[in-house]
């Protein structure tokens, strides 16, 4: 088995067919299996998958334990030499996953690779390639400095805006909306860290891979369209906002807190709580 395509679904029925129907063309000549974990959807997703895609392996969670727990469930039963982690609101382009797998086959020291990800309108999703999310890079992103000064590397350390989006580059992380992982890398570093309910589990996983000596690459010769925020995030927006901020907090304290003073760690905590309150307040006002 060449590749196991692993998808976590939560109330994304309206987008599933677009994703699943494009898989054969995206995989080229690869032999593959598709494993879908449904995270307690309430929109008829489970019945839809069972009726329309009986050849796919469906795992059903009876409550939402979080994205990371669900993707690990899929990985544990997978058999492929490569793992393609894919969001249900993603639309993989022709030979997109095949291209990433061939890239890994030609580069034995690369453990993880991600494609160029575009939005529905064709615009580039900068979050598909990442630097290390240290405080300076994260705050530049939060404050909009990276977007305002896209060519200034003092501010673009997180989404690497200064790099050409059409060039292959080594990066520190790629997006879990679509990433391909070598089985040997999985055996070396283990599963995704389930302390992350959702969000930043992909950045954490890539950083762990790099710490073990694996390289992580962005390859724009593979293109995947990602609607973003559909399904799970849209189902419970306040929960999504909370988990997004909590994951950044956990990521920082897992990897970087020991590099900074206690005073700075307190400041970081206060800043994240403040941003969470602002984000949730902004959402409620819009309602």
Residue locations for each model-derived region?
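Short, acidic, metal-binding catalytic loop of nucleotide-sugar glycosyltransferases
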Residues: 21-31
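A short, conserved alpha-helix in the catalytic core of glycosyltransferases
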Residues: 163-223
